[in-house]
């Protein structure tokens, strides 16, 4: 009776290896599709999975095929419409007049895009790939955890690129030795017995013939053991290990004044949700301080920061003063890596903008590793932007970007937090 043993280790996800290889091969197309998809999501739906579409032409394997032109002879079965020697007109290519989404095509050519679903973890990994907190340094107390990829022995499952030839051959040798040990022992005994019988008198031809047949059968069984089996294959294994690093705090400052309409606030919320997901996904121990401001600034929790309806006038310096107070009370710059991200529409009381410049230049920027300012507006820049432009020219740890449309959010986010090369 034959027994089939399933040695696959993926359980229900038996195509996981092929899926991972597919994600690596078409990473650029997938990341482009994700960048387009994130702008269509609601504020509360940024971290779920996503249906990704890739043009079919990008994933087709190269192949030789017959061209559309030329003359070819074919034999088709007859029916009640055609008889022998009838000439059949060449059909037009299909696809343009189908029922799929999009505009109709006049040339009859077309093909649907390839659509597949990626999980939440795959989505977030691709979303935040190659991003990191800038200028992160190791301070005295190490609590923040970064994850880095390390070799972690070998695994019985993987992609061909990671196969370990030496370890696989070692397993093959061990398996063949174990499976044939008894047969080789019996073979040596029979060979010794045959040798003794050939050297003794009288000659026993029938007994010698029997021994030779048994020896031939044993050798055949030993040779039938495969040289390499899927059970022998071993792949280099890699895993993400937590590595202690410096502790960090991120200040999120958001303008909620009356000049910020709902669309502008939603774009600011999208940016901060991306930032929060990035921090919580990449680092294990990061403090996040939420500050909302109009004429007055207030430290709030996550729920109130994103969903409170409170509004008022605009004095940006109130948020900067509150941030400075919180730093002095709870976050010693000698022990903490301090980061800040400020979002506003740029509308500020004119006399307050120089004060913002002074607070940043003299108090905050000397303490922070990185300060990013995002102005969300379609109007011309005002005094606050011009004051901050002067800071950007003088301070390397200050960055500013302009967001006009929801499509700008993700590119701006990647520009502000791209991983810096050493």
UniProtKB/Swiss-Prot annotation:
InterPro entries: UPF0229 (IPR006698). Residues 77-90 have a biased composition (Basic and acidic residues). It comes from the Bacteria. Residues 77-109 are annotated as: Disordered. Residues 92-101 have a biased composition (Gly residues). Belongs to the UPF0229 family. HAMAP family: UPF0229. This is UPF0229 protein Spro_2732. It comes from Serratia proteamaculans (strain 568). The lineage of its organism: Bacteria, Pseudomonadati, Pseudomonadota, Gammaproteobacteria, Enterobacterales.
């Amino acid at each position: 009776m034959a027994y089939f043993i399933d040695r696959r280790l993926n359980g229900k996800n038996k195509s996981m290896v092929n899926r991972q290889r597919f994600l690596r091969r078409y990473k650029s197309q997938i990341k482009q599709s994700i960048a387009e998809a994130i702008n269509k999501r609601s504020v509360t739906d940024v971290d779920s999975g996503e249906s990704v579409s890739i043009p079919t032409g990008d994933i087709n394997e190269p192949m030789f095929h017959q061209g559309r032109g030329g003359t070819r002879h074919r034999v088709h079965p007859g029916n009640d419409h055609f008889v022998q020697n009838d000439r059949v007109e060449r059909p037009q290519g299909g696809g343009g007049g189908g029922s799929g989404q999009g505009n109709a095509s006049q040339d009859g050519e077309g093909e649907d895009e390839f659509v597949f679903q990626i999980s939440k973890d795959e989505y977030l990994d691709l979303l935040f790939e190659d991003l990191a907190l800038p200028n992160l340094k190791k301070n005295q107390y190490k609590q923040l955890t970064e994850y880095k990829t390390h070799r972690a022995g070998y695994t019985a499952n993987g992609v061909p690129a990671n196969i370990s030839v030496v370890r696989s051959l070692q397993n093959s040798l061990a398996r063949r030795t174990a499976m044939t040990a008894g047969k080789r022992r019996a073979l040596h005994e029979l060979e010794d017995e045959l040798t003794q019988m050939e050297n003794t008198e009288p000659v026993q031809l029938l007994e010698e013939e029997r021994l030779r047949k048994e020896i031939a059968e044993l050798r055949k069984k030993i040779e039938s053991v495969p040289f390499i089996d899927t059970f022998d294959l071993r792949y280099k294994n890699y895993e993400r290990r937590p590595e202690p690093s410096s502790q960090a705090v991120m200040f999120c400052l958001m303008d909620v004044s009356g000049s910020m309409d709902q669309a502008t606030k939603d774009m600011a919320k999208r940016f901060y949700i991306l930032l929060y997901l990035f921090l919580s996904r990449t680092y294990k121990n990061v403090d996040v301080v939420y500050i909302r401001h109009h004429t007055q600034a207030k430290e709030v929790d996550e729920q109130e920061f994103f969903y409170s309806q409170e509004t008022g006038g605009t004095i940006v310096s109130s948020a900067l003063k509150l941030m400075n107070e919180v730093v002095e009370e709870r976050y010693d710059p000698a022990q903490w890596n301090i980061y800040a991200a400020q979002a506003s529409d740029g509308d500020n009381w004119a006399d307050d903008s120089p004060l913002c410049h002074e607070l940043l230049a003299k108090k905050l920027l000397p303490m922070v590793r990185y300060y990013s300012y995002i102005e969300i507006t379609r109007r011309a820049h005002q005094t606050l932007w011009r004051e901050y432009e002067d800071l950007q020219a003088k301070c390397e740890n200050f960055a500013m970007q302009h967001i006009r449309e929801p499509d700008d959010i993700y590119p701006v986010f990647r520009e502000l937090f791209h991983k810096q090369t050493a």
